[in-house]
Amino acid sequence: MIRTIQAEEITRNIKEMCIEANHVLSDDMKNVFCDAVRREKSPLGRQILEQLEENLKIAGEDRIPICQDTGMAVIFLKIGQDVHIEGGSLADAVNQGVHDGYVEGYLRKSVVEPVDRINTKDNTPAVIHYEITDGDRIDITVAPKGFGSENMSRIFMLKPADGIEGIKEAVLTAVRDAGPNACPPMVIGVGIGGTFEKCAEMAKHALTRNLEEEPPTGYAGELEKELLEKVNRLGIGPGGLGGSVTALAVNIETYPTHIAGLPVAVNICCHVNRHAHRII
């Protein structure tokens, strides 16, 4: 049976989620961050983490952005095949929600044309990823992405012979090269397989996973654990000033790939790993 959803309902939810994601970190991120404060061995690193923790608290209580870079809006939509949208197109509804959220929420407008650098003045357009699923609901994830860490992200088109050791080295290379520029402690999304664009999309989506969920089964889960340990042994530390907590998590997504390739994308996010989730 077809279920009708009004475009304005999508717009309203996107607006609220843009503001929410920029003011308050999800509970899983806050819990992992608190744990990092306890685990950090460096006195300077712990001091930095405590300052960042205080910043998170102030932002949530005063309803102000956690970071001055309120990001480019990345939206993941899982649209049930039994949904009919009435009152406008889905893309227009999403972008209107981003416009309303950033303008009415007084969030920084950071989106410009790529060459002439003219600002669009409302943080649109969003980057929208669509997936058709069963059912009559729309699953929405809003993930504002700041560009300090985005600029440190990498894609590696490895050879099949590079294997799992090549994947490990690719991730460690990206993190080493990022150093303090990604505002550590980081959350690291890794996409393995697919094509050039598929691995990048997976790496981005991996950042939205609830950090308190069970890790993936098989080699991906083991690789997450190993890479997190290796990354934290790099000693980059909070703020890039040294310490035992360089990353809060490594999240991996995989997809089958061509016999001739091994694409790997590493999407780095700073400690302000923002995402809001709703189902309508």
Feature names for model-found ranges:
Residues 1-190, 195-280:
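Non-transmembrane, aqueous-exposed alpha-helical and coiled segments at domain scale
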